[in-house]
């Protein structure tokens, strides 16, 4: 397969494709649909790797077909694999590169023609399709590309502390909340233990007398346990 600039044997002027002194006659016999994607080529002048597009050509038939890529402006493009063969029921990728991305070529439409013919030296043309090509100007001027954005970005509100200071302010609060939770939990466990201990005059208890609590102590433990329950429910 040959690489290089696309040929201009079919499309050589600004007129409609297929007309003119060098226009090709329409295909005779069965016509094969030319399936290509994308249907139009849009090049961007600000592409980092250079303005290029990938054109995929499909062969829906059961036989191999020969293809050619023609163009109205061959000096502006380089087509890799400008002609070759497509296997049956398969596809091939054609890389097209715009080699003249200058301002005078912005928004100028060119035309490519994909021509399919039967396999062989003098195979008849069985299908052709024309697609348009256009070069778009950069989104930003070239002299501004690669420079930092001059527009200032909004900063945090005046009363908002820096992230580092905020981190150091929130960290002690988290430690305080953790220690308070542990204190409340320990107090609740002690209160429940007081409620489970027997009274001094309770008979049948196997615990020593020192672990017997009075009724007043149980009332205080029940009151503290109620307060802790309210605190946990509110949080």
UniProtKB/Swiss-Prot annotation:
Tell me a GO cellular component.
Answer: membrane
Query: Keywords of this protein's UniProt record, alphabetized?
Result: Membrane, Transmembrane, Transmembrane helix
Recorded hits in Gene3D superfamilies, A to Z, give: Immunoglobulins (2.60.40.10)
Q: Which residues form the MSP domain?
A: 33-145
Q: Where is region (Disordered) located?
A: 1-25, 143-171
Q: One Pfam family of this protein, by short name? A: Motile_Sperm
| Coiled-coil residue spans | none
Topology in membrane: Multi-pass membrane protein
Q: What is this protein called?
A: Motile sperm domain-containing protein 3
Give the organism, scientific name.
Answer: Homo sapiens (Human)
Taxonomy, top ranks, is: Eukaryota, Metazoa, Chordata, Craniata, Vertebrata
Q: Which gene encodes it?
A: MOSPD3
């Amino acid at each position: 397969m040959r690489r290089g600039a696309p040929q201009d044997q079919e499309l050589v002027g600004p007129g409609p494709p297929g007309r003119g002194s060098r226009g090709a006659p329409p295909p005779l016999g069965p016509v094969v649909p030319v399936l290509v994607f994308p249907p139009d080529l849009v090049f961007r002048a600000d592409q980092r790797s250079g303005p290029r597009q990938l054109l995929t050509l499909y062969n829906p038939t059961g036989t191999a077909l020969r293809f050619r890529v023609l163009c109205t402006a061959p000096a502006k493009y380089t087509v890799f694999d400008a002609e070759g063969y497509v296997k049956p029921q398969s596809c091939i990728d054609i890389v097209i590169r715009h080699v003249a991305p200058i301002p005078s070529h912005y928004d100028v439409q060119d035309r490519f023609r994909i021509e399919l013919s039967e396999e062989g030296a003098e195979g008849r043309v069985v299908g052709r399709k024309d697609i348009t090509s256009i070069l778009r100007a950069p989104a930003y001027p070239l002299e501004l590309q690669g420079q930092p954005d001059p527009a200032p970005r909004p900063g945090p509100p005046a009363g908002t502390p820096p992230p580092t200071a905020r981190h150091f302010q929130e960290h002690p609060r988290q430690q305080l909340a953790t220690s308070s939770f542990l204190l409340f939990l320990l107090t609740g466990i002690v209160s429940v233990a007081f409620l489970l201990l027997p009274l001094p005059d309770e008979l049948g208890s196997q615990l020593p007398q020192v672990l017997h609590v009075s009724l007043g102590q149980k009332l205080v433990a029940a009151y503290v346990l109620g307060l802790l329950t309210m605190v946990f429910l509110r949080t």
